[in-house]
Amino acid sequence: SLGLQPKTTQDFILKELEDWASFGVEGHFHARKPWLSYHEMFAEPVSKIVGAKPSEVVVMNQLTSNIHFMLVSFYRPAKERYKIICETKAFPSDQYALESHVKFHGLNPNDTIVEVEPRAGEHTIRHEDILFAIEKNKNALALVFMGGVNYYTGQVFDMKSITHAA
């Protein structure tokens, strides 16, 4: 899923490795691009992608770790509200994280995770099918977990409408 390596990547990584060798832990403060504040350079461009203010965005860790942090905070299954709706063929580690948290709460992923999939003969998920799944499961729904763009198909989801429906 990484695609082709950009031509400048190797030089960039080698410079970071040189700084690590030269500065050790002090690279957090004295590297050519100090590591301590590294995340700050991403706030502005990422905020535009997610429709937030730069002060509301932080880029940290790696995606799967962040998904686990998010699930610990927001997935609170109850007796009647325990289901998770997600798109089929989400990034595999996203699926593993969902299954992990469902099992942690003593639930069966087959009964808990509702995957919305394309109709027979189609390659993308119809928006109305996502909204239907939300409506159909509304009394048992604890979380809607949709990526903004499906990594496998490139399909862009209407997150505003999905969020409003949920």
Stretches with model-predicted labels:
Residues 1-166:
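Pyridoxal 5′-phosphate
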